[in-house]
Amino acid sequence: MAEKEPDVRRRVPAAAGSGTVRRGDVARDGRGTLNDYPLVPSGSAVDEVRADIIDRLVHAWQARLTLSVSPAALMIAFYDWGMHLGNAPGKQAALVEKAARKWVRWLTYLSRVAINPGTPPCIEPLPQDKRFVDDVWQQLPFCAIYQAFLLQQQWWYNATTGIRGVAPRHERTVAFAMRQILDVFSPSNFLATNPEVLWQTFSEGGYNLFRGVRHFIEDWERAIAGRKPIGTEAFQAGLNVATTPGKVVYRNELIELIQYVPSTTTVHPEPVLIVPAWIMKYYILDLSPENSLVRYLVGKGFTVFMISWRNPTAELRDLSMEDYRRLGVLKALDAINAICPNRPVHACGYCLGGTLLTIAAAAMARDQDDRLKTITLLAAETEFSEAGELTLFLGASQVAYLEDTMWEQGYLDTRQMSGAFQLLRSNDLIWSQGVRQYLKGERVPMTDLMAWNADATRMPYRMHSEYLRRLFIANELAEGQYEVEGHPIALSDIRAPIFMVATLTDHVAPWRSVYKLHLLTDAPIDFVLTSGGHNAGIVSEPGHPGRSYQIASRPAGGRYVDPETWSAITPVVDGSWWPAWVGWLAEHSAAPGKAPGMAAPNAGFPSLADAPGYYVLEP
């Protein structure tokens, strides 16, 4: 008989980030309100509590107007930058000189290109900037316009960086903010200054603009109604994505555990447990049949289990990181041990799921729990001191602002989360898409990966607050200060072999940050650096064009090699990294034999539903 799970919905923990317990912290509908504290004693205590609630409600209201960006964090950063720049006459003089040189440089280019249209540009865009690659940008007056924009962009970068005394975090924030402002006013974003759009408008008689207006209205109506982007209806979990055959063999208040049907006559005895991130739905690893990592593993003779996380509502606001470890990873392992008894498990975690798996593995190592045969981490961070531009949104002020937003809602909404990720690549994900769809009138063809990306989830208030404060801000996991069941864990306790994958252009988990696990454990590590980004680099099936990777092994207790040296000396291999991982799993597995049965009803784990289950279908 499966163990009945405790009801976590009604617990009232310490308010996230405050360290104090407040009665009535959760309203009947899971939302925080001014009337949530009727039982607090009168006097100064109630005054403090009510003042705190008023502040939180005001911040939550402000967040709707500022896209959840803390105005205080921006003001502090700009104040730091402005004060130090104002007290740096040498820097000011250098900036004036740079401006004069750029002005002369632009005028010289303008005079030459007027005589010789083939004159090389006076400044080239960055390699990742694809806004001005079309040949029509090399014609007057558009070449002069975009060259002036690039020179101005370069000058502002010089103006916001390299000022003595400015806190590095504030410098990055100001530079990032100025880049966002400049991107808004890029000549590629406007009809009158974008020659590609102008020529298309002339050739189509303006019909492209008509289509663009129609697209904008369609998208606006869907956004207001909270519906997914147009085209996502073509990809439905269980119909044409997440179609690998399987059964839900365990369910609790937080997860469904899926066991996939074997497709080979024999399988390796060690099962594979995949712990995906709960920031999105699990089926990124089981997309279409041709690019499903799950189907690929099953086809190579492995018994695969997948955690499917529930999409939390306001009622589940008090779920904690410990709940995700206990009700997620540990309960899944218990079920797998019942279905595949006496067999160690290959555990694989993706993104946030990999971080959680590392926490669970360190706690298991501390407690001498040896159920993990190997650990695979896909684009997963364990050390957060250099976690990339995402940390710009995660200072103390910004996290407090997010906490107040989540306190009022009970969770972090999908749109609030996706907005931060889009800003990290605003050129590609916001402005270029806007130009294509609303000025050129072209719909971006929907793909399975894009549809999955639109199928976002919510993050519970307490869990997300703990994740941001304890991991991103305090870096407790890497510092040996993260506690599980009241005692600290250390990644150095992990002895199981580790296979680690990072992606070259990852803006969520930068590969150098992922690489830092080499400093935190002496376990043997096989490290893979693959082409692509956070998602596309992982969904990299064999035969995918343009894929390549680097791979090297560090034995247990081997010497440390810094990431730059590692990248320089490790050869590049063409193709997908999937076969290398499957080969590594096979090396750490026993010889194939008879497949285990589906589920274990006699042990309390019957088949509950067909894959993909119910939780993945929840809105």
Language model segments and positions:
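Amphipathic, low-complexity, repeat-rich surface-exposed segments
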Residues: A2-I258, P262, V267-P269, M280, ...
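Alpha/beta-hydrolase-fold enzymes
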Residues: Q152, W156, T160-V213, I217, ...
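Short amphipathic alpha-helix adjacent to the substrate-entry channel of hydrolases
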Residues: D286-V304
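Alpha/beta-hydrolase active-site loop
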Residues: L316-C340
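Gly/Ala-rich beta-loop-alpha elbow adjacent to hydrolase catalytic centers
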Residues: G349-G353, L357
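Catalytic histidine neighborhood in serine/cysteine hydrolases
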Residues: L468, L517, D522-R559
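Short beta-strand/loop motif that positions the catalytic acidic residue
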Residues: M500-A502, D506
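Conserved alpha/beta-hydrolase "acid-adjacent" motif
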Residues: H507-S513
